[in-house]
Amino acid sequence: MTQKIKCALIGPGNIGTDLLAKLQRSPVLEPVWMVGIDPESDGLRRAREMGIKTTAEGVDGLLPHVLADGVQIAFDATSAYVHAENSRKLNALGVLMIDLTPAAIGPYCVPPVNLKEHLGRAEMNVNMVTCGGQATIPMVAAVSRVQPVAYGEIVATVSSRSVGPGTRKNIDEFTRTTAGAVERVGGAKKGKAIIVINPAEPPLIMRDTVHCLTETEPDQAAITASIQAMIKEVQKYVPGYKLVNGPVFDGNRVSVFLEVEGLGDYLPKYAGNLDIMTAAAARTAEMFAEEMIKGELNLRAGTAASATETA
C-alpha cells in the first residue's frame, strides 16, 4: 500500500469542504482531521459522516492529537486574522502549513508558475494567494516570461453564493495579497486586483479578466503561444479552466478573458473559484508529501513561518 501523509483541515466552510473531497482522491495525502468552531456546521457534519475526526474547539482542539495521529500537513481555510496564530501553534509541532487565507505570512505559491521553486527549501508555511490570484497570475506570468510587463490588473468575478463569511471578511486582504502576487509571482512591475461578488440568480460561473501593459510593443505570436501553453498547464489540475477570448492586443495592452468551471465537489460547477484554490492547494501539498515520503523533507518542530510582505 502506498504511504500517505496525514493532513488536517482548519475551517469547514466552502473552501475547506471542497478541499476535503479533493484530498480524499489524493494518492499521497490522507485527511484525518477537520477543525471548526461551530459544532453544528455543515462542514463538520459532512466530515464526521466521512469518518474524519472533528473538533469544534478550533486549532486548540487539534493540538493534543497532532503527534498521536501523525499529522504532518495542515490546510488553513479560515481567515487572515487568525492564520498567523494557527500557523505558529502547528509549526511548533512540526506541521507544514498550507495557507488558503490571504494572510500571506509565507511565500506565495501558484503551481503552474513557481511550484518547483519551493522544492528543497524546508518551508513551514506556503501561501496559496487567493482564488482570483490562482486563476489570473498564470496569465500575467505567461506574458511576463515573453517580455517585461509594466502593469498587470486582474478582475475576478465570482458568484455571491460561492463566497463564504471568511472571504467576505477578508476583501481588503484579498485585493492586497492578490496585487502583491501579481507583482512577485506574475512578474508585473505594478499590480492591481479587483474582486466582484455577483449576486445574480442563478449563480454565474467564475469569470476573470487580465490586462497587462507591456513595456514595449507586444510580440503577439510569442505571447499567444505562451498563454496557450500556460492554459494547458493549469488545465492539468483544473480541467474547467478555459480561455474565452484573447489574447486581445490594443497598443501595448494585452487582455485575456477566462472562465473557470468547478468539478462540483461541494458547491455546483459555477463555483470555479473554489476549485482553482483547492486544486492548487492539493497539488502543492502533494509535492511536499512526495518529498516527505522520499525522505527529502524532514519537518522541524518550532520552525517559524518565513515572513513575506503583503504590499
Swiss-Prot record:
UniProt cross-references to HAMAP family, sorted A to Z: Ac_ald_DH_ac
Family: Belongs to the acetaldehyde dehydrogenase family.
Superkingdom of the organism of origin: Bacteria
Keyword Cell division: no
Listed name of the protein: Acetaldehyde dehydrogenase
GO biological process: catabolic process
SMART domains listed in its UniProt record: Semialdhyde_dh
GO molecular function: acetaldehyde dehydrogenase (acetylating) activity; NAD binding
Signal peptide location: none
SUPFAM superfamilies: Glyceraldehyde-3-phosphate dehydrogenase-like, C-terminal domain (SSF55347), NAD(P)-binding Rossmann-fold domains (SSF51735)
Active site (catalytic residues): C131 (acyl-thioester intermediate)
EC number: 1.2.1.10
Source organism per UniProt: Ralstonia pickettii (strain 12J)
Keywords (A to Z) from UniProt: Aromatic hydrocarbons catabolism, NAD, Oxidoreductase
Binding site for NAD(+): S162, V163, G164, P165, G166, T167, R168, K169, N170, N273
Catalyzed chemical reaction(s): acetaldehyde + NAD(+) + CoA = acetyl-CoA + NADH + H(+)
Disulphide connectivity of cysteines: none
Any one Pfam family match given in the protein's UniProt record, by short name: Semialdhyde_dh
Coiled-coil portions: none
InterPro entries: Acetaldehyde_dehydrogenase (IPR003361), Acetylaldehyde_DH_C (IPR015426), NAD(P)-bd_dom_sf (IPR036291), Semialdehyde_DH_NAD-bd (IPR000534)
Top-level EC class: oxidoreductase
